[in-house]
Curated annotation (Swiss-Prot):
The active site is at H250, H329. Keywords: Hydrolase, Lipoprotein, Membrane, Methylation, Phosphoprotein, Prenylation, RNA-binding. It holds the Pfam family AAA_33. Exists as monomers and homodimers. InterPro entries: CNPase, CNPase_cat, Cyclic_Pdiesterase, P-loop_NTPase. GO terms for biological process: adult locomotory behavior; axonogenesis; cyclic nucleotide catabolic process; oligodendrocyte differentiation; response to toxic substance. This is 2',3'-cyclic-nucleotide 3'-phosphodiesterase. It is a lipid-anchor. Substrate binds at T252, T331. GO terms for molecular function: 2',3'-cyclic-nucleotide 3'-phosphodiesterase activity; RNA binding. Its main location: membrane. A lipid is attached at C417 (S-farnesyl cysteine).
């Protein structure tokens, strides 16, 4: 017997019955096993983030059930925007351009209010539509979690014909199916820090840059940061590393380029990646480092976190002889014309030198730990006490290009920033 509840079947059931069914059923049904529903650490961590859950799937596949469960789990501070409420029939967006305009205005309104958990319930089968949503997430600094039903019939058009509330035919459903058959891969996967953890780490990085810039040992090495034509008395490192990530910080695991990068699909298909998607983790920061090109934080991965670290990242010669996961880092800033990928390479360069027996010269103590000069304008602050930061494992789906970053409650554009 089919125990799923479509809009048609649960309309006449008491709300109390549905609430009882959904909360208990979520623990038992395999199709409802998602970390953001089952794992209490993840639920608590998501309350500290701004997350846009984008549901994808054919009509009748179980999206609305998932949407209601997310609303129920997160209570206050949660809003759902459903295409159904705008009388949008799944199919061509061109037929409902005005309805989608109203939907997007309402969604953006919730973003401006800093609603912690937003749920968008629609088929979301078109790449162009998803790109619009990802751009909005960038503008309002929301992390994205794509959610697709795990029901056995999610791609079975014959069954979905009977389940969907719009009475779409099997042929109608088949037209929507191609955009939903393959996993939608991000620009990259990674751990995305909560807002509080991002602010804490960003502040620690800024303080380090200020302390380093004022340190007498650093002032003697300014030639690595300033050309010969410039004055060499002092350098404002916070301004020097002006290319900084807006919003939440992150630690990249796998660069996917939306599925075009080597090994991207294989990585995304790993059971541990699927199981961990949308789950909370606690990352450990052991050191802060600066080179003439980048500023970053070294991340020490646990055995559990290393399962999400792609093996191909440890193949380049820069990683040779180093433990798996040595490249794990959070980019705090880049110098002009430097790409964020350089941060990990700079860290590997430092670690190779340390492995070779040259930890550098200890030049003093800072409030958070011991400062080392490694030559060539490279500096590392070894933290006396490791920093623990909370993060969600998910993907970044935007374009990674400059976008107008909107203020939240005050509204309006604040600045143009690049997602890095």
């Amino acid at each position: 017997m089919n125990t799923s509840f479509t809009r048609k079947s649960h309309t006449f059931l008491p709300k109390l019955f549905f609430r009882k069914m959904s909360s208990s059923g979520a623990k038992e049904k395999p199709e409802l096993q998602f970390p953001f529903l089952q794992d209490e650490d993840t639920v608590a961590t998501l309350h500290e983030c701004k997350t846009l859950f984008i549901l994808r799937g054919l009509p009748g596949s179980g999206k609305s059930t998932l949407a209601r469960l997310i609303l129920e789990k997160y209570h206050d501070g949660t809003k759902m925007v459903s295409a159904d409420a705008y009388k949008i029939i799944p199919g061509s967006r061109a037929d409902f351009s005005e309805a989608y305009k109203r939907l997007d205005e309402d969604l953006a309104g919730y973003c401006r209010r800093d609603i912690r958990v937003l749920v968008l319930d629609d088929t979301n089968h078109e790449r162009e539509r998803l790109d619009q949503l990802f751009e909005m997430a960038d503008q309002y600094q929301y992390q994205v979690v794509l959610v697709e039903p795990k029901t056995a019939w999610r791609l079975d058009c014959a069954q979905l014909k009977e389940k969907n509330q719009w009475q779409l035919s099997a042929d109608d459903l088949k037209k929507l199916k191609p955009g939903l058959e393959k996993d939608f891969l991000p620009l990259y996967f990674g751990w995305f820090l909560t807002k509080k953890s991002s602010e804490t780490l960003r502040k620690a990085g800024q303080v380090f840059l200020e302390e380093l810039g004022n340190h007498k040992a650093f002032k003697k090495e300014l030639r690595h940061f300033i050309s010969g034509d410039e004055p060499k008395e002092k350098l404002e490192l916070v301004s020097y590393f002006g290319k900084r990530p807006p919003g939440v910080l992150h630690c990249t695991t796998k660069f996917c380029d939306y599925g075009k990068a080597a090994g991207a699909e294989e990585y995304a298909q790993q059971e541990v990646v699927k199981r961990s998607y949308g789950k909370a983790f606690k990352l450990s920061i052991s050191a802060l480092f600066v080179t003439p090109k980048t500023a970053g934080a070294q991340v020490v991965l646990t055995d559990q976190e290393l399962q999400l670290w792609p093996s191909d990242l440890d193949k380049p010669s820069a990683s040779e002889g180093l433990p798996p996961g040595s490249r794990a880092h959070v980019t705090l800033g880049c110098a002009a014309d430097v790409q964020p990928v350089q941060t990990g390479l700079d860290l590997l360069d430092i670690l190779q030198q340390v492995k070779g027996g040259s930890q550098g010269e200890a030049v003093g103590e800072l409030p958070r730990g011991k400062l080392y000069s490694l030559g060539k304008g490279r500096w590392m602050l070894s933290l006396t006490k490791k920093m623990e930061v909370k993060a969600i494992f998910t993907g970044y789906y935007g374009k990674g290009k400059p976008v107008p970053i909107h203020g939240s409650r005050k509204g309006g554009a604040m600045q143009i920033c690049t997602i890095i």
